[in-house]
Amino acid sequence: MVKTITVSDDVYNELLRIKGKKSFSELLRELLREKKGNSVALKHIYGILNGEEYRETRKRLKELEKEFEKWKQFLTQV
């Protein structure tokens, strides 16, 4: 079954840029899997860290995400 969705031009252009040779369905499926994986990982560590450790871990993860995004942009420009 096929469904039609509407996205803004900037979102479409970003998806088009990162999809490469994949179909939009493949790209969206991959992005959803990544998002679900992050959620599962966070649920797994819930309760293991105290408040300060949790905040520090989240801060470091955000820093890493920014660096990975820069790396991804570099790789897609080459």
UniProtKB/Swiss-Prot annotation:
Keywords: Toxin-antitoxin system. InterPro entries: Put_antitoxin (IPR003847). The keyword Cell inner membrane does not apply. Transmembrane segments: none annotated. Possibly the antitoxin component of a type II toxin-antitoxin (TA) system. Its cognate toxin is VapC4 (Potential). This is Putative antitoxin VapB4. It holds the Pfam family VAPB_antitox. Belongs to the UPF0330 family. It comes from Pyrococcus furiosus (strain ATCC 43587 / DSM 3638 / JCM 8422 / Vc1). The keyword Cell cycle does not apply. It comes from the Archaea.
